[in-house]
Amino acid sequence: MANVLDELLDRGYIKQFTHEEETRKLLENEKVTFYIGFDPTADSLHVGHFIAMMFMAHMQRAGHRPIALLGGGTAMVGDPSGKTDMRKMLTKEQIQHNVDSIKKQMERFIDFSDDKALIVNNADWLLDLNYVDFLREVGVHFSVNRMLSAECFKQRLEKGLSFLEFNYMLMQGYDFYVLNQKYGCKMELGGDDQWSNMIAGVELVRRKAQGDAMAMTCTLLTNSQGQKMGKTVGGALWLDADKVSPFDFYQYWRNVDDADVEKCLALLTFLPMDEVRRLGALEGAEINGAKKILAYEVTKLVHGDEEAKKAEEAANALFSGGADMSNVPTVIISKEDLGSTVLDVIAKVKIVPSKKEGRRLIEQGGLSINGEKITELTRTLNDDDFKDGSALIKRGKKNYNKIEIQ
């Protein structure tokens, strides 16, 4: 039987191991319980989390048991990893709302039936910790000198690192220990930016529990230039259909750079690797067919088959000059909005994230209505724009929205 590690390596998921040979043997010989932590600082996951969930799904399909750890407790502190400033503090109520929303999203990707996977919240054990006991039982195993040399703290020392954030590594390490004791968890998976925190957890479990503990990091989703993927004009590429429509989500993947198609197919779909390599090797006009497959497969996983088909049909209709516009993302305005500037309206209904961004689009010639380029910031919406019952807004080269009047 093939080791899931070979599949993960072949697809390009794994960046680093704490104990590579031990990890390989463990995955060959046992059904391993492992965990990935998710920071509930927003009420939706984004595409950066999606790669972690695909990592989990491949492991689960190979017979291993995932634990999705929602950081309801650690979110009260804030993770300094990769940040140059202290994060905004969230209230307990905000964090709980985010935890509840994320749970619902995760259930679309991971099978939680019959104890095949677990969702737990570290608030359940962190919020009631006795601080003195925690220092005696956990703090004693951490060297401050070594912590300060960790990459996640180095970046913050010049600007100032609060003692609150300094505790984060201990708390994340303690999470691994609790999951090890309670559920037999032996492995942590996570983003490569979490490497220092993950090492701390592995070492804590090995010292306190005297048992197996290991970690491996997942590559971050970057393009061929090394820049993080998943950013749009409106911000992050959220998995929530209310934040980013299935059509816009589909279009994002339909428009990735040719050089990124194979990597995205490998990391974000379940297509066999032979097919991934075949599609990734296509050139010229043929690579567009591979991009359509990528967009459809990723949208299907995130939003379901029906929404993926609708997005595909809408894109085909738009780019072939077809008439079916029913699946293009639609916003509703009132008759009172007629006479307002196009800029004011598209900002009001969130077609663009702000008037500043809308102004930039117009000034750069990137906004049109019904095929007519908007060249003046003072251009107003009028009845003529809605002769066909709706107005079609185009942002950039391939982003569309319909405006209808109610």
Swiss-Prot record:
UniProt-annotated location(s): Cytoplasm
Binding site for L-tyrosine: Y35, Y168, Q172
Any one GO MF annotation of this record: ATP binding
Binding site for ATP: K231
GO biological processes: tyrosyl-tRNA aminoacylation
CDD domains per UniProt: S4, TyrRS_core
Quaternary context: Homodimer.
Protein name (Swiss-Prot/TrEMBL): Tyrosine--tRNA ligase
Lineage: Bacteria, Bacillati, Bacillota, Clostridia, Eubacteriales
Designated gene of the protein: tyrS
